[in-house]
């Protein structure tokens, strides 16, 4: 009986002992998971998968073998917790028994993949704009190419051009893209075209560009500056007579955000400006005082940051949001920058849909064809002239400039100068023509600009003047009038009065000098007269 009892106890231990070890193994893993989770640094979570941790009873295994398996599992989990893993948010302990053998996830399943991104751009990473010649809106192959270069896609373009912008640290991006038959260029930074200067009203200057005598050289003399003749004439005596206001024309401005104003809005929904450039451009375009197109609608593509800079990729993305206006429309760029085939292609596409595109030539005193978007064949590229209709020292020049307009001495209450202001003035004058001819083609617009511009004294470039448009069958110009008299009569009167005053002062001075000299001579005669001999 003793031996029978020992056999029964051994059998029970064989059955219940294995189960106990199995249960303890799972419980031990749970405890280890909780303890390890407390010791883990923030951001690392150890999670138990119930379905994977339920082990089937290994009926053919001995207790020693089961104990060995338990130690192996614990060792494996501890190693994975203690090993540093950057960028990993979860570590899953995977243990599974298949029949008599244990199949556990190897270390490769717990290693972070190469595609995991931390969200930061490394110092060696560069950003690019990738496009293809055929505009079909399909970017799938381009995205696959970017992924093969270990890059991350930032933007996709499907409306004006087909392309993507991406960043990659791959050292051979240009060659890989060329082999794929696509066009790639590095992302660039574009800046607003502005400088600083003290300036009066630009319309007043435009009015005197062609005058022979009463030109801006005449009004710029020191006497007129001291007496503030120009300010008196523009503020108190002058009135701008116009017959068209650009009504029904939609103007889109790519620039910094603008402050709240009637007839204008930021497409991003922002209500305040953080840079004065956008406000000045808006004032020149649709301002009730300083703009030609006083009744045009202005929408601002406010993709330019507060520093006056915008990346090429963000600018192209902003142009994707350019909506159909249902009427004549003008796109005005407030920025210029390095030559970009991608930007030029996008601008050409926009122009082909009937939108008039006006851009600044740039402020680098360089060849204009080296800059975009002004080098695009479909853009009206505008340079800057000074108050004497001479090309500004900062303005770009060359064959890619269509015409010039005032870029210095533009507004009385602003210190900004630059070719972007010139572009705004030209765009505002085009809006007047589109009001009367909403379906005008580019040759007609160019003819209108030719009629309302003049060639400089050397005949080498065209300068915009105050527009002349038809009104009830007549061609009348928008001019300044001073109390019903022609404008030049008033300065002529000023000249006569000032000349008379100067002559009067000169005569008074000569007269006083002569009297003083005579008095001095008389005093000398009295002082040195010899005494009279009375005897």
UniProtKB/Swiss-Prot annotation:
Disulfide bonds join 369-400. Keywords: Disulfide bond, Hydrolase, Membrane, Protease, Serine protease, Signal, Transmembrane, Transmembrane helix. It is a single-pass membrane protein. Its EC number is 3.4.21.-. GO terms for molecular function: serine-type endopeptidase activity. Its main location: membrane. One of its GO terms (cellular component) is membrane. Residues 221-475 form the Peptidase S8 domain. This is Putative subtilisin-like proteinase 2. The gene is SPL2.
